[in-house]
């Protein structure tokens, strides 16, 4: 397991990005400042054991996704802050520097209500 953490909550605006136009989640360690916590899915602090790579499987709330691209800032901020943007676009190029692009089933807020964690 390269990164194993548990969802501990989410901010009141975090789920607004799970729409057809955006289709992403912003994640942060639960130590995020309040202004960032309001727009983020928060998770327990965990050590990045090994960098995730294109082709790896990411499991979010018991739903599996394949990493299709990683932005040039994503691994640094994931390691330092537990932060990145998980984009469900399936794009083979990162749409933003902090994105990890994922391919798989549609992710909805209902998955978060059954949250059991985030694993890669």
Located regions from the model:
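N-terminal, charge-rich interaction modules
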Residues: 1-23
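Short, basic/aromatic beta-hairpin or loop at an interaction surface
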Residues: 23-41, 85-99
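A structural micro-motif recognizing beta-strand termini
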Residues: 28-30, 42-47, 103-106
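Short beta-strand-centered aromatic/proline hotspots
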Residues: 64-73
């Amino acid at each position: 397991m390269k990164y194993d953490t548990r969802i501990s909550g989410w901010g009141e605006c975090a789920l607004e990005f799970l729409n057809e136009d955006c289709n992403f989640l912003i994640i942060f360690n639960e130590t995020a400042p309040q202004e960032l916590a309001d727009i983020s899915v928060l998770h327990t602090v965990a050590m990045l054991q090994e960098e995730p790579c294109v082709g790896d499987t990411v499991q979010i709330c018991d739903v599996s996704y394949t990493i299709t691209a990683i932005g040039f800032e994503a691994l640094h901020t994931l390691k330092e802050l537990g932060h990145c943007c998980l984009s469900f676009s399936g794009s083979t190029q990162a749409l933003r520097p902090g994105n990890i692009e994922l391919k798989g089933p549609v992710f909805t807020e209902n998955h978060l209500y059954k949250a059991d964690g985030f694993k890669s």
